[in-house]
Amino acid sequence: CDGPLQYVIWRKMLKSISPAPAVLTLDPESAHPNLILSKDLTSVTERESPQVVPRSPRRFLQSVNVLATASFESGQHYWEVWVGNKTKWELGVASDNVDRAARVRLCPDNGYWTIRLWNNSEYWAAATPWVRLRPQCLLRKVGVLLDCNAKKLTFYNAEEMSHLFTFHQLWASKFYPFFSTGFSHGEKNAEPMRICHPLRH
């Protein structure tokens, strides 16, 4: 997987996005009790037993999910997520009014627009119906571009900036970056997910 020219062009385009790409952090009050966040709130790891955490209406209780602290209502926003060698993960955006206490299917009808790695080898867009993704190589870093004004969400392989999938007609008024580690199943999926800050030097 190599696309240096495409990568350079994309990086130049990022500078024109307004507002500029935000530095995201994870929201501890939204994190499922099995999730451990790093001190700088940029990475998340799942543990097999829950922690004792304060009650919060923002907290996910049934699935190992966490949201970013920031939400977006207008403009374009880009961020990258390092998934490395994880065997299972899901990421994208969620609407501000998703049901966090119940186990629901992550799909646009329920306020989620995501892609996922399933069974260590299958990439899917959680559309209706699901769409199988066939990237040219394993995804280790995923780029997410949210265009609130156009109601559009696009995913890229951030290591070579190839297009993965685009959701259209997003219907929420406010969007939160969304992350789900998947259960670790011992050591197989223990690697953390990490928010990257692509324009930080």
What are the language-model segments listed below?
Residues C1-H201:
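Beta-rich ligand-recognition domains in immune and ubiquitin systems
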